[in-house]
């Protein structure tokens, strides 16, 4: 039988090379959680039985992981396991993940209230002029992500100069491949000009 950790690392690297950075990150996070639980990188697929899965689930809950985080790790592990079965390096077990949680739950409210958002947007520009440069940059990037209609950080980080045309930015989502166009408000344009790489050789 093959080694789960080695195979998971191989899959994550393949995802990264194909540009699926978000998914690759999830695979690596799941892999690290499994290593922490197992205590070593030596873990054969044969040992990943239903008892192991249930124990891993209990471990994640003891670490205060939400049920949605548990589900993400389990679904990732299931996807890796199924790939390994297809490659004949893991044993096929019907309904192998039946007894662990792989659903979704609304554990808690994640959106800010309107009042909180208004206060944040009012105070944030002021603080950008009052704090150390590292914190200024962090707050500025958060503000910019909001102004760009909630652009994910990975997409913001991979923006190129040619993505901007006048007062619009057109970019392709790293996660879905979908092409999106966002109109730049003056505040967003100021932040982009402040933090963009001015090196002529930089894309």
Question: Can you say where each PLM-predicted feature lies in the sequence?
Answer:
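Conserved helix-loop functional segments at active or binding sites
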Residues: 62, 86, 122-130, 162, ...
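N-terminal DNA-binding recognition helix of tyrosine site-specific recombinases/integrases
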Residues: 33-36, 46-47, 62-96, 149-151
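Conserved catalytic core of the tyrosine transesterase superfamily
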Residues: 24, 111, 125-143
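Basic/aromatic-enriched alpha-helical hairpins
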Residues: 1-63
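Short, leucine-enriched amphipathic alpha-helices that occur as contiguous helical runs
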Residues: 27, 73, 117, 135-139
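Flexible interdomain linker/hinge and immediately adjacent N-terminus
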Residues: 54-55, 90-125
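Alpha-helix N-cap/helix-start motif at helix boundaries, enriched for small hydrophobics
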Residues: 77, 141, 154-157
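Conserved tyrosine-mediated DNA breakage-rejoining catalytic core shared by Y-recombinases
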Residues: 158-200
């Amino acid at each position: 039988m093959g080694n789960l950790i080695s195979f998971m690392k191989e899959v994550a690297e393949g995802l990264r090379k194909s540009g699926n950075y978000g998914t690759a990150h999830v695979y690596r996070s799941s892999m690290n959680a499994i290593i922490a639980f197992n205590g070593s990188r030596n873990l054969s697929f044969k040992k990943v039985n239903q008892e192991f899965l249930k124990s891993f689930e209990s471990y994640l809950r003891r670490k205060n992981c939400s049920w949605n985080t548990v589900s993400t790790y389990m679904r990732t592990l299931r996807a890796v396991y199924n790939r390994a079965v297809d490659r004949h390096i893991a044993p096929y077990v019907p309904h192998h993940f039946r007894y662990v949680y792989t659903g979704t739950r609304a554990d808690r409210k994640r959106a800010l209230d309107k009042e909180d958002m208004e206060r944040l947007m009012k105070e944030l520009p002021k603080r950008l002029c009052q704090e150390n440069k590292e914190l200024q940059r962090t707050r500025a990037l958060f503000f910019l992500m909001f102004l760009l209609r909630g652009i994910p950080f990975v997409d913001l980080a991979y923006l190129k100069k040619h993505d901007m045309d006048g007062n619009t930015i057109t970019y392709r989502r790293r996660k879905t491949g979908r092409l999106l166009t966002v109109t730049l408000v003056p505040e967003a344009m100021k932040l982009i000009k402040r933090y963009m790489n001015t090196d002529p050789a930089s894309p």
